[in-house]
Amino acid sequence: MGTRIFYKGPNRGTAVCNLAGNLMYEGVNKSKCILNIDGDKAWEGVNKAKCLFNISGNNVYEGVNKGKVLFNIDGAKVWEGVNKAKCLFNYTADKLFEGVNQSAVAANWSGGALSKMEAASLIYALMH
């Protein structure tokens, strides 16, 4: 996975994240650290001032108090909220779709589409 670049939208016009080691940067110039995975915690910002995600089992919580379930990975689907009322991402074949109607491509790899294997690898990398 190394130094692949994430693009947002079907036209791949905007770089979202660049994964290098365990650091994820925002933008093409890598000027800001978004996530730094340390154990089971992911921090926002270079000073690690705020806990953004805390992965426990297959649940991902938002905030330090783990008061809200942000994502719950169930098979190939990722759901938002505790009631799983809305499908946030559903990857099928080599595309990652946003929303329940799969109307928009949410993410695409540089140098090819995001495959199902790469999507699984990305989720695995973020959870380990």
List the model feature ranges, each with a label.
Residues 1-23, 27-32, 38-40, 46-50, ...:
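Long terminal segments
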